[in-house]
């Protein structure tokens, strides 16, 4: 009977939306449900989702800030076209329920589901409500959230995390017998972050052999960052464009320096890894800052605003911590984790389908 039930996941744009959706998809498939995916052809989901054996179809939709007059004028037209495309796909696939996991595609996808009479469930990963989910919550049968207090009456489930990350050993096991320089993992999202790429090599020069760095640079700054490390004669650091096995990187690290996307914050909490967060400054609602606050309040992380993120500031912060302190911070991070988020999101869907 379950095999006849079909769930359409709508998510795209970044790993922060796609990876939680894939975690839920994997769980549902393992429990006998059919999963299909609605995304965009020019973003990460177009390559990632098919690797998991999931059928995916695409609509055309982009994000606009809407500041310019001509953008404001044509944006409704493009949104209506995207909704039309999504409706055609929904009528073709005939899903029993739609799960919106965020990204620009989720707006037209969610509205198309509602206008087609298909039940919609949405999940908000960030601590601050996104504009799309704010509107979609009006039409949704269930609203789920990754952080407490985002929506006033939503169900708190946490953010679904990949199984490989859930399997990372706890901090006490990882730190046992660990000696040598402090291991610093630097991640600025899949595209890298220019402020981290610019500042971290200068920090490395100041602290020299006190630490070893695994630095995900991204594509754009890669050659410049390689040159910066060569200039200071520190060739022992690991400099890469992208880290394929993030679970291995988390297990290796003593501390993370990164942006504060919702998924990164949730993964850090699950793994138990202290962090220095440098929130992205171009979100009007400062969502990354607020994502990081629970870990800061737990004593597991620090926030350095981008304007204050200098090699002197971050060097002083790292020098003030030893491995014993970092291990204690890691345990505090785990104390606020939501390790069962994938199961909780999936069970909400399954229970609704039983009605």
Curated annotation (Swiss-Prot):
It is found in: Cell inner membrane. Keywords: Cell cycle, Cell division, Cell inner membrane, Cell membrane, Cell shape, Cell wall biogenesis/degradation, Glycosyltransferase, Membrane, Peptidoglycan synthesis, Transferase. InterPro entries: GlcNAc_MurG, Glyco_trans_28_C, GlycoTrans_28_N. Pathway: Cell wall biogenesis; peptidoglycan biosynthesis. One of its GO terms (molecular function) is undecaprenyldiphospho-muramoylpentapeptide beta-N-acetylglucosaminyltransferase activity. It is a peripheral membrane protein. The lineage of its organism: Bacteria, Pseudomonadati, Pseudomonadota, Gammaproteobacteria, Enterobacterales. Cell wall formation. Catalyzes the transfer of a GlcNAc subunit on undecaprenyl-pyrophosphoryl-MurNAc-pentapeptide (lipid intermediate I) to form undecaprenyl-pyrophosphoryl-MurNAc-(pentapeptide)GlcNAc (lipid intermediate II). Pfam families: Glyco_tran_28_C, Glyco_transf_28. PANTHER family: GLYCOSYLTRANSFERASE (PTHR21015:SF22), UDP-N-ACETYLGLUCOSAMINE--N-ACETYLMURAMYL-(PENTAPEPTIDE) PYROPHOSPHORYL-UNDECAPRENOL N-ACETYLGLUCOSAMINE TRANSFERASE 1 (PTHR21015). This is UDP-N-acetylglucosamine--N-acetylmuramyl-(pentapeptide) pyrophosphoryl-undecaprenol N-acetylglucosamine transferase. One of its GO terms (cellular component) is plasma membrane. It comes from Blochmanniella pennsylvanica (strain BPEN).
């Amino acid at each position: 009977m379950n095999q006849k039930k079909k769930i359409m996941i709508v998510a795209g744009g970044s790993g922060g939306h796609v990876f939680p959706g894939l975690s839920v998809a994997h769980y549902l498939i393992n429990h006998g449900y059919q999963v299909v995916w609605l995304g965009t052809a020019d973003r990460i989901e177009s390559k990632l989702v098919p690797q998991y054996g999931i059928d995916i179809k695409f609509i055309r939709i982009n994000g606009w800030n809407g500041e310019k007059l001509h953008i404001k004028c044509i944006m409704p037209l493009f949104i209506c076209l995207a909704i039309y495309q999504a409706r055609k796909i929904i009528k073709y696939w005939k899903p029993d329920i739609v799960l919106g996991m965020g990204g620009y595609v989720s707006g037209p996808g969610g509205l198309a589901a509602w206008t087609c009479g298909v039940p919609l469930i949405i999940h908000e990963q960030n601590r601050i409500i996104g504009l799309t989910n704010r509107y979609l919550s009006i039409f949704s049968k269930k609203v789920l959230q990754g952080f407490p207090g985002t929506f006033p009456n939503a169900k708190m489930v946490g953010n679904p995390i990949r199984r490989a990350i859930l399997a990372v050993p706890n901090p006490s096991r990882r730190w046992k017998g660990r000696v040598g320089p402090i291991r610093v993992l630097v991640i600025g999202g899949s595209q890298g972050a220019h402020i981290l790429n610019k500042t971290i090599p200068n920090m490395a020069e100041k602290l020299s052999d006190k630490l070893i760095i695994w630095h995900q640079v991204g594509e754009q700054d890669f050659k410049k960052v390689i040159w910066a490390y060569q200039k200071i004669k520190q060739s022992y650091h690991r400099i890469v464009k992208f880290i394929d096995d993030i679970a291995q990187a988390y297990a290796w690290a003593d501390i993370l320096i990164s942006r504060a996307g919702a998924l990164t914050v949730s993964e850090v909490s699950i793994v138990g890894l202290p962090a220095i967060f440098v929130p992205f400054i171009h979100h009007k609602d400062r969502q990354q800052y607020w994502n990081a606050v629970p870990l800061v309040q737990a004593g597991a992380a620090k926030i350095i605003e981008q304007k204050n993120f200098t090699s002197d500031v971050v060097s002083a912060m790292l020098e003030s911590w030893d491995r014993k302190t970092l291990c204690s911070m890691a345990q505090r991070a785990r104390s606020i984790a939501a390790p069962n988020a994938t199961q909780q999101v999936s069970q909400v869907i399954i229970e609704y389908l039983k009605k």
